[in-house]
């Protein structure tokens, strides 16, 4: 039996009940499992989407390009391509540091339990959904594989949309890489 490694989804960063950690014998199989798990919640097809996973044991990052195509019957097929190449250590470190900060974030401050307070505060709890928060880091994936690159690939980004009953917060971060 082959050795199972643990992989986690780094980009996009997702909070919710969906699994963003999988066990697999290699990064390609892990990428398929992770993308298959999150893409079921998308209501659109993504022409060109990128994601990054991390091998938890080694700390190594693997980047993927996903090409989806809608078939005549309305279903969507996707092709997962492993991108050979690496970002600069600076970009990798910024990405991992940003994800670590997101993981450490907590909700708002504690409620004021003072009975003498004139203000009334209500605490709303949001039900857990498969995807409550979707954070995508815009990274220079185009620099890793220039084959088939269109000039507009540098200036556009394809993002998923989510349908009812899902309503995650979507955040696109442009602060890790500047041209």
From Swiss-Prot:
Entry GO terms, CC: virion component
Keyword terms, alphabetized: Virion
Organism, scientific name: Acanthamoeba polyphaga mimivirus (APMV)
Subcellular locations according to the entry: Virion
Name of this chain's protein: Uncharacterized protein L492
């Amino acid at each position: 039996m082959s050795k199972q490694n643990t992989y986690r989804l780094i980009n996009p960063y997702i909070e919710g009940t969906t699994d963003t950690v999988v066990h697999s014998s290699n990064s390609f199989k892990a990428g398929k499992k992770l993308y298959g798990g999150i893409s079921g919640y998308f209501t659109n097809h993504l022409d060109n989407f990128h994601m990054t996973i991390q091998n938890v044991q080694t700390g190594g990052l693997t980047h993927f390009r996903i090409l989806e195509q809608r078939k005549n019957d309305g279903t969507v097929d996707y092709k997962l391509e492993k991108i050979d190449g690496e970002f600069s250590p600076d970009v990798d470190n910024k990405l991992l540091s940003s994800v670590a900060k997101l993981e450490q974030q907590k909700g708002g401050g504690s409620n004021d339990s003072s009975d003498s307070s004139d203000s009334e505060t209500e605490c709303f709890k949001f039900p857990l959904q498969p995807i409550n928060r979707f954070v995508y880091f815009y990274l220079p994936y185009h620099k890793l594989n220039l084959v088939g690159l269109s000039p507009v690939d540098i200036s556009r980004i394809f993002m998923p949309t989510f349908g009812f009953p899902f309503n995650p917060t979507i955040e696109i971060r442009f602060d890790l890489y500047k041209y």
